[in-house]
């Protein structure tokens, strides 16, 4: 999982004597003569410029930005719950686009999942899988009007969860109810 991946990366960073700048937020790229020369940050609310030979934007996506979700995924996505971190707000992508970078890849798609309607707006990363509701192949899914809107048995869950998660967004109140009989146990 992500937490263990970060732990191993931090060990490598420390072993190589690289400084980690905590309590910092990147605000802009330092861009001169068609070259990214560094990054502007807010460090404990104080603006600083950090110059570097190279800059890597390892900053995540935009899933936690309602505005960017709506712009790239379409109407209705501003209200979607996020199964990941609340910190992926697209700031790094916005900085890159601002200096002329081209968006690459599929910005109009995402891995949406059935998510607990009473769960938090953003998942607790230590228990993120607890909020995902992906047992639909063993029951039926209906919307708030009592209508089925997906074929729960279309394929294995691994091949349908993102597609079905997107379908929930299109439903009244963005709700899908999973219904099971007494034979299904979790």
Residue ranges and their predicted role:
Residues 93-95, 99-186:
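An anion/pyrophosphate-binding glycine-rich loop and adjacent beta-alpha core
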Residues 27, 44-46, 55-57, 61-63, ...:
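Short, glycine-/Ser/Thr-/acidic-enriched flexible segments
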Residues 1-47, 65-68, 114-118:
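Conserved redox-cofactor binding core of oxidoreductases
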